Amino acid sequence: MAAAMATATKCMSLNPSPPKLQNQTKSKPFISLPTPPKPNVSLAVTSTALAGAVFSSLSYSEPALAIQQIAQLAAANASSDNRGLALLLPIVPAIAWVLYNILQPAINQVNKMRESKGIVVGLGIGGGLAASGLLTPPPEAYAAAEAAAASSDSRGQLLLIVVTPALLWVLYNILQPALNQINKMRSGD
């Protein structure tokens, strides 16, 4: 929704004047009305301020409400829930494909860093972040994960039934290029 609002405000700021007709004849009014004074602020500034107000109001929403609802679901049903696993299974091939495509550029980057001694700097920054605790998730994330794992309903499985045909279609479209790439790698071209 925020993206749609931002697009709308951007579109309004790109074309501030209405389109003019080519063969427009001017008519003289019977009564002359005074023209209102023009505002000093341009439309681009106004639309930017409007977008800022909308986004700031969206950013102040209460995130604790979702965690509280998950905790209530967890308290109501004490059996285990497999929704996370059911949703993860169809996504694993897509993630593996993305990682496969990222692997070679990542290896190239590491080799460039080794040549320029940049890996020492990268490890130093990573070690500093890990030592300061910036890489660990907050305890609230663990509580939300535990609450989600404790609740039990079959909505995840129903979602899986709906999503499965789309994921199968994506996998079908990925399969032939993947086989072509494997054959190219085997032939050594």
From Swiss-Prot:
Q: Where in the cell is it found?
A: Plastid, Chloroplast thylakoid membrane
Q: Which residues form the propeptide?
A: 118-143
Q: Kindly report every residue range on the membrane side named Lumenal.
A: 75-83, 139-157
Membrane topology recorded in Swiss-Prot or TrEMBL: Multi-pass membrane protein
Q: Which GO terms describe its molecular function?
A: manganese ion binding
Q: Which residues lie on this side of the membrane: Stromal?
A: 105-117, 179-189
Residues spanning the membrane: 84-104, 118-138, 158-178
Identify the main location.
Answer: plastid
Alphabetical keyword list: Chloroplast, Manganese, Membrane, Photosynthesis, Photosystem II, Plastid, Repeat, Thylakoid, Transit peptide, Transmembrane, Transmembrane helix
InterPro entries given in the database record: PsbY_plant, PSII_PsbY
- UniProt region (Disordered), positions on chain: 1-24
Which GO cellular component does the record give, naming just one? photosystem II
- Biased composition of type Polar residues is found at 10-24
This protein's transit peptide sits at 1-74
Q: What Pfam families does this protein map onto?
A: PsbY (PF06298)
What role does this protein play? Loosely associated component of the core of photosystem II (PSII), it is not always seen in crystals. PSII is a light-driven water plastoquinone oxidoreductase, using light energy to abstract electrons from H(2)O, generating a proton gradient subsequently used for ATP formation.
Q: What's the family?
A: Belongs to the PsbY family.
State the remark under miscellaneous: The central hydrophobic segment (residues 118-138) does not form a membrane-spanning region but could serve as a targeting signal for processing of the precursor in the thylakoid membrane.
This chain's protein is named Photosystem II reaction center proteins PsbY, chloroplastic
